[in-house]
Amino acid sequence: DIYQVYGYKTLPTSNLYAFSIERSHQLMHDNSQIGMIIPISAFANSSMEELQQLFKSEFGRMYISTFHQRPAQLSDGVLQRLSIFITTKHNSEHTIFTTGINRWYTETRDKLFCLLSYVESPQIYQPHFVKLGSKIEVDIFNKYVLHTPIRCYIGGNDNPNNSLYYRTAGGGYWVTFLNAEFDCVSVSNKHTVIREEVIAKALSAALNSNLFWWYYSINFDLFNFKDYMIFGFQFTYTDQKSLDSIIKLSDQMETSLRTNAIYYSINSVTNGLNETVTYQKFKSKEIMDAIDKELTKVYEFTEEELDFIINYDIKYRMGDELNE
């Protein structure tokens, strides 16, 4: 009991850095500032909601920059996705400025902080913080949040022909959704049934889009991939006729993913010989782009906004494929 923490708003987070931030706020002078380097998850994941509420209610003007761990790390030997926040004690101004997700190669590390760019970022639509880095991202976000979360379309009797199939592990830059069962058994394989009046293939196409990758990147910690993250994606399902092109693209994506899949065996001491499959989704990039072009009609994005979405993170997602 001597090491027990009592009376902290952030107790439910069970995280020492959350307690440290709350205590630091208590010790701050009205005109003082504070800055720390902490994991991205502090601003992104639902498990840190009490800390996020503290940031939004108890601090003043805030600057948050975000740094991925690949291809290079913020500090050598520290393989973590990190955020740096600088803020004041609460006052009449409670504006939040953010960067996008910063990635860089080792040889450009010395220019990293000189090139940081912040934008005033809307943070009223969700308890966590979104990582927006430019005005065009803010414009896209403000259109995107007008739509319905996919979780509203979940339910009904188990129907394997109208379900979403996905994995909650692996994938890296390329998270994959299928219209039918995976070709191998894995504890991370999951499926969710969609209501019968909604065509699951339309949702699958939307989840396989570049827009979904942007949504996932700006909202979460880029490590965990949980159901609440997936089904929080906002997409307004209208009717089958108006979404016919998206449904056809979903079939094309399914064929492409399975055609380009790599099958191999893993022999481990604990589990023995197992068959597994990797879906080379980067080879389906043209279909992804076509899906985003169709989604533009749903979200009413401009051509400039569509171009941003299609090319979001492309330098690091495609890598050498861009040079082929």
Show the residue positions of the predicted features.
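Generic, well-ordered alpha-helical scaffold segments in large soluble proteins
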Residues: 23-31, 40, 54, 58, ...
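Short, well-ordered beta-strand micro-motif
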Residues: 84-88, 193, 234
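Non-catalytic DNA-recognition/assembly elements of restriction-modification systems
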Residues: 113-152, 162, 239-324
